[in-house]
Structure formats: structure tokens, C-alpha cells
Amino acid sequence: MEYSYPLNPDWTTEEMTIVVQFLEAIERAYEKGIDTQELKDKYRAFKHVVPAKGEEKRIGIDFEKASGYSAYKVMQLVKNATTSKIKMQP
């Protein structure tokens, strides 16, 4: 798929990398499946860059519009996960 990630130009290169890694993990949750702990770790790092709920929500909405993948739905599944790996159903 060809789309761009919702990034803030004020972020450092390292911060952009962290956000992209989290969004790539969301993609993997839909496409191949992902280890629950790995996704939790990526989310924790993402929250250090994007601590505000409002900005997190905006990034999630922009990403879903561009990709069709919902970060919110993935993280809800992770929060309630009882398995070590999750895969979203399309």
C-alpha cells in the first residue's frame, strides 16, 4: 500500500522513527499478526513521543483514513488479549 504516515515535523528523527515503528506494528497486526508484548512495547515508546490523548487520537484517525488500519481497535484487542500473538480480522 502507498500512503504516508501522519508525522509531526517538530519531532526529532528518533521520535519519527518510534512513531513509524508503532504504526508499522499496527500494520503487522492486520497483515501477519504480531506478538502482543512487542506491540505493547512499541505503544509504550509511542506514548513517550505522543503523551497527549488528543494527539494520539488524531494520529490514529489520520492513519486509519490513509491505511484502513485502526490503531484504536488493535490496542483494544491488545488490552484484552489472552494470547501471546494477535491478528486482526479484516
From Swiss-Prot:
<dbReference type="InterPro" id="IPR023324">
    <property type="entry name" value="BH2638-like_sf"/>
</dbReference>
<dbReference type="Pfam" id="PF05256">
    <property type="entry name" value="UPF0223"/>
</dbReference>
<comment type="similarity">
    <text>Belongs to the UPF0223 family.</text>
</comment>
<protein>
    <recommendedName>
        <fullName>UPF0223 protein LMHCC_1569</fullName>
    </recommendedName>
</protein>
<dbReference type="InterPro" id="IPR007920">
    <property type="entry name" value="UPF0223"/>
</dbReference>
